[in-house]
Amino acid sequence: MTARQPSSRSCFVCGRENQAGLRARWESDRRAGEVRAEIAIPERFNGYPGVVHGGVVTALLDEAMARTALVEGGFEDLMVTARMEVAFRQPVPTATPVTVVARLRRKTGSRAQAEAELRLPDGSV
């Protein structure tokens, strides 16, 4: 069963009122232990023509991983990023529906480790 996650109005990634942002809608799946969003990233976020800027891809992955803490807990479990490593495997096309998926790997006190991936329509990462 999935549930829509709340968003912050002005957040660059999820803010519904941030006209300059991505306005991603996030859902939690408690059974799968995942957070996911489906989004077609507009061309204004190009790095090169037709390709999403790597910083925007990284922002989506960062947001997804931070939101994994909300699957079991609440806003008191919000996390901030201390360290993040991204491996870019292929370009992400703009204006194409993609799925961002994140899972919490481990949580100990105020520290957590999560992983995320961005899937293209053909299922590739």
Where are these regions (language model features)?
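HotDog/MaoC-like acyl-thioester-processing domains
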Residues: 1-4, 92-94, 103-125
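Non-catalytic linker/capping segments at the edges of enzyme domains
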Residues: 1-44
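Short solvent-exposed loop/turn micro-motifs enriched in small/polar/acidic residues
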Residues: 19-20, 79, 109-111
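Hydrophobic residues on conserved beta-strands that form the core of alpha/beta folds
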Residues: 23, 81-83, 113
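A conserved, well-ordered hydrophobic junction motif at loop->secondary-structure transitions
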Residues: 36-63, 71
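Hydrophobic beta-strand-centered segment that forms part of the acyl-chain substrate-binding groove
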Residues: 64-99
